[in-house]
Amino acid sequence: MSRLRIRYGAVASSLAVLLAGCVHGNPTTRVAVDRGYESVYLALLKDARRCYPATAGTAQREVNGTLDGPGRAGKITFSLRSPTAQETFMNVDIRGTESTRSQVDIQVAPGWEAHAQAVRGWLEGTSSACV
């Protein structure tokens, strides 16, 4: 049984290492939203936590968010955590461009594009589906 756990841990750790640095080098999907940045941030964070609930286990998905009131911005990171590493597979940056308008940039690691499409669906109100 412990060998099986070690193998799963090694696989999760290897996957996390492969994801390292992949997010930042990829093209950004930009979405304009007719809502204020804080409203967009809170709605996205709620959907993200619904679709990526905190779990226990060898390979976990994790969602973290930060809101910067003075900077009129927010950031949500989607990560894969293993016992030995944590690597981000998607970043969502939200910036208020006007009082009721926001710009959202989505960067995703290769192989995780369906997750970015899900986020876009949440933003545009065309889908509430989880991947």
Language-model-derived ranges and their functions:
Residues 1-12:
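Bacterial N-terminal signal peptides that target proteins for export
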Residues 18-21:
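C-terminal motif of bacterial Sec signal peptides marking the signal peptidase cleavage site
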Residues 24-131:
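Ser/Thr-rich, low-complexity intrinsically disordered terminal regions
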